[in-house]
Each structure stands twice: as C-alpha cells, then as structure tokens.
C-alpha cells in the first residue's frame, strides 16, 4: 500500500479554500461592480500571489511522486482549454487565457521534457537555483529581470506579443481574469519538486504523512473537481444575494 502524504493534501485543501474565498470576493467586488479597485489593492495582490504560489509549490512536490504525469498534464490542458472557450463565449469580459489549469498542464509537460537534465542537479542546489531564477523572472511582465529591486537587464521588446503570453510575455492589450504564465511560476513548481527530492534523500518524507485533518485533506484530494465547479456555484450564490445577473 502506497504511503499517503496527508500534509500535501491538507496544504492543497488550504489553497483551494483560498481560491474559493478569493473568487467569491472577486465576483462580489469586480464582477458585480461593488468595488472595481479591489483587486489592485496591495494586500489583495499579496494574498492572491501567496495563495497561487502555495498551490504551485505543492503541485511541484506532488509531481515528484511521478504518478501518471503525462496523462494528468493532458487532462489539465484540455480542461484549461474548455474553461477558455466557456468564458470566451459566456463571460467575455472575464475571459481566461492561460489560467492555473493550463499552467499546471504546461508545467508538467515542460518538466517531463527536461526532467533528465533537472534530475542531474542536486536537490539543495536545485532549490537554491529555483529561488534565484524565480526572483530574476518575477518582473518579466514589466519587461525586466531584477534581483530584489535592482534591475539587471531588459527583455527584448519583440518578445512582448500575445503569442508568447503563455511564457509570461504579452502586449499591453492582453487581458485574462486568471493568468498564470510559465515565468516565473515554473521555478516555484521546480522548487517544490526539488524540495520533495531533498526530503526523500534525507528520509524525511514521513514528515508529510501527518496533518490528516479531513476539513483540509478532503478538499485537497478533490481539488480539481472543486476548482472546476466552484465558480459556477459562486456565480449562482451571487445571483441569489443580488437578485440579478452582473
């Protein structure tokens, strides 16, 4: 019987709670127009970034388990495409291009493609390199690579076309209500992968078997289904609260 890492399930469940609460408030304040400036507040952006980051990091750790990763990546890519088409048709003002599901599918495939090279890097060095690369790439949307606020160089302007949006480069006309590009998030995904490898090397993975609290582990083990269903349910709830469509 395979060992279950309950702490990973719990962390993923915690992250999905974050997603539900954040999207409910987004629907109330932005979609229903109560406060259109809400998503631009500093604390909201930090909340969104940290919640997304936790999801990505944990997913990188789960990827290291190596369970049906290609098939899982394909499933996520298809679901991401369906969400893009659905929002484009039924909610064009909140259309989603390259959202979190598309990112996970792309991250899995890209990692599989270069896995033979990544595995040659010692886990501790891989974690360190992932952190450095994440910091360097976090301002790619602003056209620069920086290191703790110090600009190192500018990316070529020709990169900033919408055809490269999945990578993190896009024009000023690009919009997506849920946008998780490969840069810088792939490095957080790889950090999670190397973190699990480091724990496994030191025989510390038993630390991940604790935390079996159903309130977190249950949604963690059903995170994909919950993610797909939560937004239609939230929009239905908002319709009941406000008595109208947006």
What are these regions (language model features)?
Residues 1-246:
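Alpha-helical transmembrane segments and their immediate juxtamembrane cytosolic regions
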């Amino acid at each position: 019987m395979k060992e279950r890492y309950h702490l990973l399930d719990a962390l993923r469940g915690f992250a999905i709670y974050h997603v539900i609460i954040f999207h409910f408030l987004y629907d109330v304040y932005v979609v229903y127009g109560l406060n259109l400036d809400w998503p631009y507040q500093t604390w909201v952006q930090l909340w969104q970034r940290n919640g997304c980051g936790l999801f990505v990091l944990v997913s990188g750790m789960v990827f290291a388990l190596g369970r049906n990763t290609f098939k899982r990546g394909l499933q996520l890519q298809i679901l991401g495409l369906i969400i893009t088409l659905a929002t484009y048709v039924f909610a064009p003002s909140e259309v989603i291009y390259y959202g979190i599901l598309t990112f996970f599918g792309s991250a899995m495939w890209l990692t599989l493609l270069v896995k033979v090279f990544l595995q040659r890097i010692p886990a501790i060095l891989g974690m360190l390199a992932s952190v450095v690369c994440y910091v360097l790439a976090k301002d790619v949307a602003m056209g620069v690579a920086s290191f703790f606020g110090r600009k190192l160089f500018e990316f070529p302007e020709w990169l900033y076309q919408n055809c490269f949006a999945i990578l993190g480069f896009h024009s000023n006309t690009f919009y997506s209500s849920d946008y998780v590009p490969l840069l810088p998030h792939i490095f957080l995904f790889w950090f999670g992968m190397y973190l699990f490898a480091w724990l496994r090397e030191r025989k510390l993975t038993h630390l991940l078997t604790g935390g079996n609290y159903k309130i977190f582990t249950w949604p963690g083990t059903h995170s994909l289904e919950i993610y797909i269903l939560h937004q239609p349910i939230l929009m239905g709830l908002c319709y009941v609260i406000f008595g109208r469509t947006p």
